[in-house]
A protein has these predicted regions:
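A residue-level marker of the well-folded mature domains of exported/periplasmic proteins
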Residues: 1-198
Length: 198
């Protein structure tokens, strides 16, 4: 590294949305669906991670041959209560959805709560989140959240330490590409969720 340059340690935010989109596309194909209605809950508008997570989920569906109609798309600003209120209002519109994509687990949990307190009180379509928080993983395990995508804080910490030590020693850092040390996200489903529960 030259003086003044920095190293980024983290996950390419597009990979989170790609995991969500690929997961849903597989489900839709198994059900014989090629055109679906999607509700999308985003984090705070204008943030880089929100833009990338949202766009990459849409692109993954499209790349898998799924025509998605975004019948609802709004920010709930990462907030469970806002997502719950907005989805409860949306359900009152009579519009149907085949899946709900959320930029984080908290909003996904809000959508699930709205489903469980309205109508027939069931989670009537897949709801997907990002972060694999403790409560998110619990929802995946019980089957109310279809999947989440794990952000590995331990791997981020280890990567940061590895890069810092390498820079101090003037050594080449394995895994560093163009000043970017990537942490690969992991899809969390009912099949592997026990590996992520603390």
């Amino acid at each position: 590294l030259k003086d003044g340059e920095v190293v980024y340690v983290g996950t390419d935010e597009t990979l989170y949305g790609t995991e969500q989109g690929n997961y849903l596309a597989k489900l839709f194909k198994e059900d014989g669906k090629t055109e679906v209605n999607i509700a999308m809950f985003t984090g705070t508008l204008g943030l880089d991670n929100v833009t990338k997570r949202t766009a990459s989920a849409k692109k993954a569906l499209e790349d898998n041959g799924i025509k998605a109609n975004y019948v609802f798309e709004n920010t709930a600003e990462w907030d469970r209560g806002k997502a719950m209120d907005q989805f409860a209002q949306f359900m009152g519109s009579g519009e149907t959805v085949d899946a709900v994509i959320c930029n984080n687990d908290e909003m996904a949990l809000g959508v699930i709560e709205a489903m469980l307190t309205n109508g027939d009180k069931t989670v009537f379509c897949p709801v997907v989140g990002i972060d694999a928080t403790d409560v998110g993983c619990a929802a995946v395990k019980e089957g109310t959240m279809a999947c989440s995508v794990f952000q590995d804080p331990v791997a981020q910490g280890e990567g940061t330490l590895k890069c810092a030590l390498g820079l101090l020693k003037g050594e080449e850092i394995e895994g560093l590409v163009d000043n970017y040390y990537n942490i690969t996200p992991q899809l969390v489903t009912k099949e592997n969720v026990d590996n992520f529960i603390k």
